[in-house]
Regions:
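C-terminal beta-signal and adjacent terminal beta-strands/loops
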Residues: 4, 582, 635-641, 670-720
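Extracytoplasmic beta-strand/coil segments of soluble accessory domains associated
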Residues: 59, 84, 88-131
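N-terminal periplasmic accessory domains that precede
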Residues: 83-86, 108-114, 123-128, 142-148, ...
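Short acidic/polar hinge/loop motifs at secondary-structure boundaries
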Residues: 130-159, 247
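Gram-negative outer-membrane beta-barrel transporters
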Residues: 191, 356-364, 369, 431, ...
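Transmembrane beta-barrel wall of Gram-negative outer-membrane proteins
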Residues: 200-273, 294-305, 416
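Membrane-embedded beta-barrel scaffold of Gram-negative outer-membrane proteins
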Residues: 209, 305-310, 314-332, 478, ...
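Structural signature of Gram-negative outer-membrane beta-barrels, strongest in the C-terminal barrel
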Residues: 254, 263-264, 361-377, 409-538, ...
């Protein structure tokens, strides 16, 4: 939980940074360009270097794989209040509502192309290029997702052709949350949003603050704050409190060299209302029968980045240190009794990533060769505790019961990654071969304790070493300045996690997959479109299943994920002047993710939809902006892990098919302009027609989880 000392520290830091920012206002001016003109022999061609920097639609057009950028304006106009809302806008990405042990706004459950969504383990998730998971190798789950929406400028989702530069756990692509940049002149903005739910009588507020600027000497500073506070739509035990503060600094050393630093602190706590049995859901889908389930976590990280770019050469060094903690309380059910479990865990890691890129010319052929390295060292300390069993009907306060540790573990990983790729431009063609080499050494020392919580009864000392070459080849052809075609093939890899190392008797292996894409990008002032065919062949895939109250990792074996992703946005005013201000868009994704081994061979994997789609329209008239959105998904499966593929709902509400659904949202916004200090306000509604939908979970607090009911929201933004 957030302590008073932490709050006092954050307050003092915020006050100091705000004072420094105000001192910049008087002298702030637009800085001079940070790169020189290209060398004469290169004409307009300049080195790209890190293609995660400054994501734009032009970069998407030049990327030889599926890539989607969701910008801040689109985030605001969809009424998004969480990372989940934004990622639902991306073709191929499916988002599970909060459920199970990922059952609060502090966590993030996303699955790409039919991959498991529970705690987002198979996408490499970054914020400004820095990993956001507890431990990128040993604990990649996002039960704590330390990113708050109000601090973001855009969300960059790279689903293909990224595994050479970024990893591990990249079979589900790379997701980079891009925070707001330090402005060239002094700027500040405060905003707040509030959601009011039609059930539970609850409301949730999302305040944010941004202030920053750059002075004439090239020194820039920015303070960003974003939070979430309030209760959700369940009748009890679903309060959320999130505070996310980021301080960014930058200094332009010369026209070719600059440095950037950041200091980030995130604290979040979320109550988890838990799942319902089939009978409980039928009686009241919004009730909660769990009073103690909760999750809290915090993360502090710092990063430093040096960048040199002269048109032909680009050298970059990124270093970061991350310290995080997470704790949870969850009740376990057994024969009409319960016991309270706790799982405090601490992690920290240090990483350094140098990279060098250089342009070469050979006649009409231009090459950009990039070489990079990453050293990452991480450690973990985990404790598992539990009370004795009790009768929940008569227990007044389970938190007052003695709670005893029964297992401890100390883990760590030392990893070296090397990569090289060569972007070869020949006329309209770009061919990029590359390879990444991962060398990983991991261990997890596990001690099982007796009933007294101190006597060691048994120990395990598993280790794992991995040496993996991950080649990729991508090809892009430019039909013209607005249209490109692409294809790529590569190999992705996921090392064993700490919890998997401890299960030595189950014969678990690192995950590996081969990925293939063919597609196209189109970008013009009137039309923006993308179309991608994809195929993922998993040689090995691990799955977390439940045996009684315990979570067990099993080797699911071979799986195949294939399908088509598409999206289109059209400015109808470019077609007919009478439709000026009207823009419409549509997206559709078909995914087939099936097991190719075991009892469920040929059957759908759990908790993904074969069909997902969106239809939206935007109309701007004067100072008004009107938005309408429709989102739909087909049914999902929750078949269990036994020998029978379950399709009918069980009494616990954990297994059985999940019906598809569609929801409609409307929004109206007004910009007062200079008449009222550029104030922007909006009002909207989500799930307009009160469509009742749900998901399932097989966790200890699993069952049926009702989705968002009709929700009214208001937004206000004031620049100053």
């Amino acid at each position: 939980m957030v302590s008073s000392n932490h709050c006092a520290t954050l307050t003092r830091c915020a006050a100091a940074v705000a004072a420094a920012l105000l001192s910049l206002q008087a002298s702030a001016q637009a800085p001079s360009p940070t790169t020189t003109a290209p060398e004469a022999g290169l004409s307009a061609i300049t080195v790209t270097g890190n293609w995660l920097d400054n994501p734009t639609e032009e970069k998407v057009l030049d990327h030889a794989g599926a890539r989607t950028i969701v910008e801040r304006a689109r985030i605001e106009e969809t009424g998004s209040s969480s990372l989940r809302d934004v990622l639902r806008l991306v073709p191929g990405v499916q988002v599970q509502d909060s459920n199970g042990t990922g059952g609060s706004d502090v966590s993030l459950n996303i699955g790409v192309r039919g991959l498991t969504a529970r705690l987002s383990p198979r996408s490499y998730v970054l914020m400004d290029g820095v990993p956001v998971s507890y431990a990128p190798y040993g604990q990649p789950q996002l039960s704590l997702a330390p990113v708050s929406l109000g601090n973001l400028e855009s969300v960059d989702v790279i689903r293909g052709a990224g595994s050479v530069r970024y990893g591990p756990q990249n079979v589900g692509g790379i997701i980079n949350f891009v925070t707001r940049a330090i402005p060239k002149t002094f700027a500040a903005e405060a905003s707040v949003g509030t959601e009011i739910y039609s059930h539970g009588g609850n409301a949730k507020t999302t305040p944010s603050l941004f202030v920053g600027g750059t002075n004439e000497s090239g020194l820039g500073l920015a303070l960003l704050y974003s939070g979430t506070h309030g209760d959700g739509w369940r009748a009890g035990n679903d309060k959320t409190d999130i505070d996310d503060i980021l301080v960014k600094g930058a200094y332009r050393i010369s026209a070719q060299d600059d440095i950037a630093v950041s200091l980030h602190h995130f604290e979040g706590s979320g109550r988890m209302p838990g799942g319902l049995t089939a009978a409980q859901y039928a009686a009241d889908p919004f009730q909660s029968t769990r009073s103690y389930d909760s999750f809290d976590g915090r993360r502090t990280d710092a990063s430093f980045k040096y960048n040199h770019k002269d048109g032909r050469n680009n050298f970059e060094v990124l270093g970061y240190y991350v310290d995080s903690f997470r704790g949870s309380y969850i009740e376990q059910d057994n024969a009409n009794q319960r016991r309270l479990t706790a799982a405090p865990r601490s992690y920290h890691y240090f990483g350094i990533e140098p990279r060098y890129s250089r342009l070469f010319e050979t006649g009409s052929v231009v090459q950009e060769v990039s070489v990079g390295y990453r050293y990452l060292k991480e450690s973990s300390s985990e404790v598992a505790l539990r009370t004795a069993y009790y009768n929940p009907a008569t227990m007044a306060n389970a938190m007052a019961l003695p709670i005893t540790p029964y297992q401890t573990s100390q883990g760590g990983t030392t990893a070296h990654a090397f990569y090289i790729d060569d972007r070869i431009d020949i006329g309209n063609w770009t061919i990029t071969p590359g390879v990444r080499y991962e060398r990983i050494n991991s261990f997890n020392n596990v001690s099982n304790l007796g009933a007294d919580g101190s006597t060691v009864t048994s120990q395990l000392f598993p280790k794992a070493d991995a040496r993996e070459f991950l080649p990729t080849l991508s090809v892009l052809y430019r039909m013209n300045a607005q249209w490109s075609l692409f294809a790529n093939a590569g190999k992705s890899f996921g090392p064993q996690q700490y919890a998997q190392l401890a299960q030595t008797e189950r014969g678990l292996h690192p995950e590996s997959a081969k990925t293939y894409e063919v597609g196209t990008h189109y970008n013009s002032p009137a039309l923006n479109a993308e179309l991608t065919l994809f195929n993922i062949d998993f040689d090995k895939e691990l799955l977390l299943t439940r045996v009684g109250v315990d979570g067990i990792w099993t080797d699911l074996g071979a799986t195949r994920h294939r399908g088509i992703e598409s999206s289109l946005r059209y400015d109808l005013g470019q077609w007919n002047a009478a439709l000026k201000g009207l823009t419409a868009g549509v997206s559709y994704t078909y995914t087939e993710a099936v097991s190719r081994a075991g009892d469920f061979a040929g059957r759908d994997l759990p908790l993904y939809s074969r069909h997902t789609g969106q239809l939206w329209a935007r109309y701007a008239l004067g100072q008004w902006t009107l938005n309408a959105d429709l989102a739909a998904q087909s049914k999902q499966r929750s078949p269990g892990s036994g020998t029978q593929y379950v399709t009918q709902e069980d009494a616990a509400g954990q297994l059985g098919d999940i019906p598809g659904f569609a929801t409609v949202g409307l929004r109206a916004g007004y910009d007062f302009g200079k008449s009222l200090s550029n104030l922007r306000v909006a009002v909207g509604v989500k799930n307009l027609f009160e469509r009742r939908y749900y998901t399932r979970s097989t966790d200890n607090n699993g069952g049926k989880y009702v989705g968002m009911p009709r929700t009214l929201y208001v937004q206000g933004t004031l620049p100053f």
